[in-house]
Swiss-Prot record:
Record's GO cellular component terms: cytosolic large ribosomal subunit
UniProt cross-references to SUPFAM superfamilies, sorted A to Z: Translational machinery components
Domain of life: Bacteria
Function of the molecule: This is one of the proteins that bind and probably mediate the attachment of the 5S RNA into the large ribosomal subunit, where it forms part of the central protuberance.
Family: Belongs to the universal ribosomal protein uL18 family.
Subunit structure: Part of the 50S ribosomal subunit; part of the 5S rRNA/L5/L18/L25 subcomplex. Contacts the 5S and 23S rRNAs.
GO molecular function, one term: structural constituent of ribosome
Protein name as it appears in the record: Large ribosomal subunit protein uL18
CDD domains: Ribosomal_L18_L5e
Keyword RNA-binding annotated: yes
Organism of this sequence: Thermosipho melanesiensis (strain DSM 12029 / CIP 104789 / BI429)
PANTHER family: 39S RIBOSOMAL PROTEIN L18, MITOCHONDRIAL, LARGE RIBOSOMAL SUBUNIT PROTEIN UL18M
């Protein structure tokens, strides 16, 4: 009997193969993206120490008041702008983008564009 492969399991496998090549340092931390059906999350991680330096999501109070929907491209762009603003405040300008096994398309691409608009370089 042929079983249907789970999409999330395949994404996790892709993410592990990507993570072998992508590594965040103090000078260039990793901007990691995770998305669920209703929300999108982004965090900047220093892999040397294993610490999250900056985080933002559609669950943040700053965005919840202004967003009508949390699952569309506009919300993803706002999360990108917010994480970019917070990173610049902490002195982080260059990052390595980790798309989390997702295609660089739709909400993931919009988050990246929002972060670039805020001043992050990748």
């Amino acid at each position: 009997m042929i079983k249907k492969e789970n999409r999330n399991w395949r994404r996790k496998k892709r993410h592990l193969s990507i993570r072998k090549k992508i590594y965040g340092t103090v000078e260039r931390p990793r901007l990691c993206v995770y998305k669920s059906e209703k929300h999108i999350y982004a965090q900047i991680i220093d892999d040397d120490k294993g610490h999250t330096l900056v985080a933002a999501s559609t669950l943040d109070k700053e965005l919840r008041e202004t967003l009508k929907k949390t699952w569309n491209k506009e919300a993803a762009r706002e999360v990108g702008k917010l994480i970019g603003k917070r990173a610049i405040e902490k002195g982080i300008k260059k990052v390595v983008f980790d798309r989390g096994g997702y295609r660089y398309h739709g909400r993931v691409a919009e988050l990246a564009e929002g972060a670039r608009e805020a001043g992050l370089e990748f």
